[in-house]
Amino acid sequence: SPADVTIIIHPVNDTPELSEIGDQEIYEDEIFEYILTAINVDDDQLFFNATSFSEDIGVKVADDTLTITPNANWNGAADVTVTVSDGFLTDMEVFTLTVRPVNDAPAAEDVAIFPSVPLETHDLELSYIYTDIEGDPESGTEITWYKDGVELEEFANQLTIPSSATLCDEVWHATVTPSDGTDVGEL
């Protein structure tokens, strides 16, 4: 006599597959954004996450958008681990984000003219502190002197105005435009 056999095939949860990200590059002071994708034959809801052991970057995932924010003026490489999960099974990828350096503009700080209350017999001395985050040397900094609001080209790039060029009741000021030979800072 014939026998009937019935089998029931139960679905198996398949691991979601994270789409390849690959190594990525950005420039210093930029934010990296990437839309994460994955394949899931079971049509399960997927959850993305990302982490990094580097203290030089901030990593966040909102829905399927990965955002990496490097610290200001930082450049270098950081490994990032991205995972996708259906709540039970997980796939992951580790990629390297390389942050390329850019030349930052230098700054002139603590700009001052001494003495602050000069007499007609005093030379005027300009002082400032040159700073550059990369440590580039000062090259091509421009100094502009003004007397009573009028630029005096004969004293361009001079740190000292001799007392013979000043008179009582004149108003003097100076601007410093710092330069590292490539970029110039703000006045």
Language-model segment annotations:
Residues 17-21, 108-111:
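PAS/LOV and related PAS-like sensory modules
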Residues 1-14, 22-104, 119-186:
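Acidic, turn/loop-rich segments in luminal/extracellular domains of secretory-pathway
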Residues 109-119:
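Pro/Thr/Ser/Gly-rich low-complexity, intrinsically disordered linker/stalk tracts
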